[in-house]
């Protein structure tokens, strides 16, 4: 662990945070109480794949630090745990429901904390106080601005990164009966891995990472009823490098999106957002996904480079017999001038 453990001899008074660390062997005749565990632990171990597929280990250091029963724990770790996944689900639940976390400092761009270092999803550090049981002060640093809120980390079913977004989300939830995480496909929507390529001939077509080509219907193993539908698909990778905003502090979120006609399927390079009987409805959904409103909602729960159905848990399903614009969506959910400005400041236009 790249950090410090501060200890004090029992009966010698309160520990001095920042004092020189004392390391005690098992043969020590003194009883020591642990006061503060602070660290910048290792973040991940490589599993033979890319960095994006490496296995996180920082969660184990946090959990072990708490097991030592210190008065305080403070660590700086990747912010990817906000949305769970990749072995982080139980850690996420533990952190969000732990009301002893007194402060959480969040950097959506890791460069603002570690110059020249790209960490997908950003970075955060926290103060865990063994005697604290209440709200957490959440401080967000974004594009040179600082936002501070006092709240419970488990106030919502999902962890919302920016406190300023909570009022927007509450308004959306009050008027919504179905969210898009109930419709978006899982990975491998048609059971076809990324390495699957078109065949020499076929009765349908395959959209893969290098284009489109002939394919055999009998090779499709999942979602057979979607083959003859109009489909809206999206790349499973986000557009923003390491989750970083552009020079103006704005994010695009989505990368490749398109409408696939009947008799066209795709590999797991893409996920299916929804299917329709008509081309018009599919095009209206595509336009909806391009709105700043939708991409802002997705951004609240996107701290990795991957897009899945879980990222659409805040996106309301609409009537797609008509197209939707940002102005119409802002009006439908009664957003204030300040709330609209917050969205516009975070999300870039998308044609």
Predicted regions: what they are:
Residues 46, 82-83, 241-243, 350:
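Flexible loop/turn segments at secondary-structure boundaries
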Residues 1-17, 27-192:
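Signature of N6-adenine DNA methyltransferases within the class I
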């Amino acid at each position: 662990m790249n950090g410090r453990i501060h200890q004090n001899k029992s009966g010698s008074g309160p520990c001095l945070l920042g004092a020189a660390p004392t390391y005690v062997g098992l043969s020590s005749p003194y009883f020591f109480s642990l006061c503060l565990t602070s660290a910048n632990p290792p973040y991940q171990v490589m599993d033979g794949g890319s960095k994006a597929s490496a296995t996180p280990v920082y969660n184990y250091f946090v959990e072990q630090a708490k097991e030592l029963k210190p008065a305080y724990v403070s660590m700086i770790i990747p912010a990817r745990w906000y949305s769970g996944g990749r072995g982080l689900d139980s850690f996420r639940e533990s952190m969000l429901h732990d009301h002893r976390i007194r402060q959480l400092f969040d950097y959506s761009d890791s460069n603002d904390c570690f110059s020249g270092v790209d960490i997908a999803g950003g970075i955060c550090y926290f103060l865990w106080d063994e005697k604290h049981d209440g709200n957490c002060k959440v401080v967000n640093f974004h594009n040179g601005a600082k936002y501070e809120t006092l709240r419970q980390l488990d106030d919502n079913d999902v962890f919302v990164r920016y406190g300023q977004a909570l009022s927007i989300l509450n308004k959306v939830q009050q008027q919504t009966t179905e969210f898009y995480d109930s419709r978006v496909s899982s990975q491998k929507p048609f059971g076809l891995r990324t390495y699957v390529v078109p065949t020499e001939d076929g009765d349908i077509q395959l959209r893969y990472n290098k284009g489109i080509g002939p394919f055999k219907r009998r090779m499709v193993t999942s979602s057979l009823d979607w083959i003859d539908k109009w489909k809206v698909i999206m790349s499973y990778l986000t557009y923003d490098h390491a989750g970083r905003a552009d020079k103006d502090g704005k994010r695009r979120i989505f990368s490749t999106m398109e409408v696939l006609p009947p008799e066209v399927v795709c590999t797991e390079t893409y996920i299916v957002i929804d299917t329709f009987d008509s081309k018009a409805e599919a095009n209206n959904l595509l336009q909806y996904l391009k709105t700043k409103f939708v991409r802002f909602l997705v951004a609240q729960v996107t701290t990795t480079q991957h897009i899945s159905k879980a990222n659409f848990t805040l996106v309301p399903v609409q009537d797609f017999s008509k197209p939707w614009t940002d102005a119409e969506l802002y009006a439908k959910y009664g957003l204030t001038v300040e709330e609209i400005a917050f969205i516009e400041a975070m999300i870039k236009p998308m044609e």
